[in-house]
Amino acid sequence: MDEQTGTFNPRVLWPDVIRLPQNRWIFTCKEIIDRLGTDVHKTAEMKKLMEKCLMYLYFMKKSLNLFDYTYVEASILFFRYWYYYGLSYNLLDSIHISQAILVTACKTMENNRPIDAYVKSTCEFVTIHKIPVGNAGPRPNMDKLKWEFRDRLVKNEKKLLCQFGFDFNDGVGNARELIEEIFSGFYRFNRDDILPDEFKKTAFPKILQESRMFIVQGMTQPVTLLCDGYKFVVMSLIYCGLEYKRLVDKNFRYPKNFFSRVLLPSLKFNTQELVETFMDYRILEDNFFDLKSNKGSKLHISEEMIRNITDEDNDFCHSNEELFDYEHIREGNVSKEFMEHIQSKVDAMYEKYKTKV
């Protein structure tokens, strides 16, 4: 019993086992670049090392047939680890850390696989890329190597959990997962039902597919340290919308208040912020990895360009329309308007069925 209020306080007898962390995961462009250091030779060596680790993550994605959002999560955790703790200049040690990061991402985002699956594929990567393994020589004993990699994985996984402070469910980092949630079948069937058919059936499916690709390709640069997943989703839609306008339909424009309707209530950023983030993204590309997937000058996006493909009353702010908010509905907060909407959808489906019969 609480002596002051006379009420039962469960935390006195059963305190929280782990205090929920609130870590900082978003940084300025300057902070990210400064993390590389000022020594030219060490910076070049570190970037080469990081690029090899990113190659490893992509190799594991293909080898284990991982979902896109699992690969994205692994990349997010990799850059966060690098920013806070750095990487060993020993390539094999960094691969071991990357392996633990990948396993943690799999456990966070999807069903875990047997540990042997990770170890086997990691050994294959090390062998294919001829990464030196101690004194084992160019052709190490695979059975011995697997046991060594297995032991390192178990050790590093425990270490990683502590280093991240058990903060793996921030909920705003994984843009690849978020874009599927924002445009899930539920929302397409309800919230987006009023959108023009030409946009829903012709333009948007192509833009959405390209946006998914934009997000996955973005994981090869530390852009996840620059902005959260929600902003990166909006950036992907803006970028791919501009590309669609340039390559397919010169008159393309998103429907009125499209972004205001799909954003969460807590989100609010203006066009200028998006322009600055695109520019910072380009600066990161110039300072980190020279890859075929880099967007280069296409990231020079102005406010005018964004306004030419959007039509928002309140910039990029939520419209406060909670009618189709799945989180509210799941908690039982269902409005009369939503019930009437569902009834109209059921009636329409029934009439469509009758005409076929």
UniProtKB/Swiss-Prot annotation:
Coiled coil: none annotated. Keywords: Cell cycle, Nucleus, Transcription, Transcription regulation. The keyword Amino-acid biosynthesis does not apply. InterPro entries: Cyclin-like_sf. GO terms for molecular function: cyclin-dependent protein serine/threonine kinase regulator activity. Gene3D superfamilies: Cyclin-like. The keyword Transcription regulation applies. It is found in: Nucleus. One of its GO terms (biological process) is transcription elongation by RNA polymerase II. Component of the BUR kinase complex involved in transcription regulation. This complex phosphorylates the UBC2/RAD6 ubiquitin-conjugating enzyme (E2), leading to monoubiquitination of histone H2B and the silencing of telomeric-associated genes. Also required for histone H3 methylation. Necessary for the recovery from pheromone-induced growth arrest in the cell cycle G1 phase. The kinase activity of the complex requires the presence of BUR2. Overexpression of BUR2 interferes with mitotic chromosome segregation. Belongs to the BUR kinase complex. This is Protein BUR2. It comes from Candida glabrata (strain ATCC 2001 / BCRC 20586 / JCM 3761 / NBRC 0622 / NRRL Y-65 / CBS 138). The gene is BUR2.
